[in-house]
Amino acid sequence: MNLRATRVGEQMKKELSDIIGRKLKDPRIGFVTVTDVRVTGDLQQAKVYISVLGDEEQRQNTLKGLEKAKGFIRSEIGQRIRLRKTPEIFFEIDESIEYGNRIEQLIRQISTEHEGGKKEEENKEE
């Protein structure tokens, strides 16, 4: 991704957060955080990664709501960011946060088991 695409992506991320948080009134759309926006080099397409607070059903409902509002969101982006052509938007759930949380949970579990093993060894020595 080139420098211009990166800059456009960062600006879109900021604007999308504002649009989704303030302009959209769809009840299906829950608490959404825009985690990343990746714009293609030709600025024709933008993949928007989102994180949704809630269960799998809430995530799917939020995605459906965002898909329905895609045209409105794109027109808002077009008004806020001066580009020859506003990129086509694709929404995806960002799994990296959940993946990171799972790894952290496993590390804690291993650490706890390791601490438990050390205490057992100390008790045996006494």
From Swiss-Prot:
It is found in: Cytoplasm. One of its GO terms (biological process) is maturation of SSU-rRNA. InterPro entries: KH_dom-like_a/b (IPR015946), RbfA (IPR000238), RbfA_dom_sf (IPR023799), Ribosome-bd_factorA_CS (IPR020053). Keywords: Cytoplasm, Ribosome biogenesis. Its main location: cytoplasm. Gene3D superfamilies: 3.30.300.20. Monomer. Binds 30S ribosomal subunits, but not 50S ribosomal subunits or 70S ribosomes. This is Ribosome-binding factor A. It comes from Geobacillus sp. (strain WCH70). The gene is rbfA.
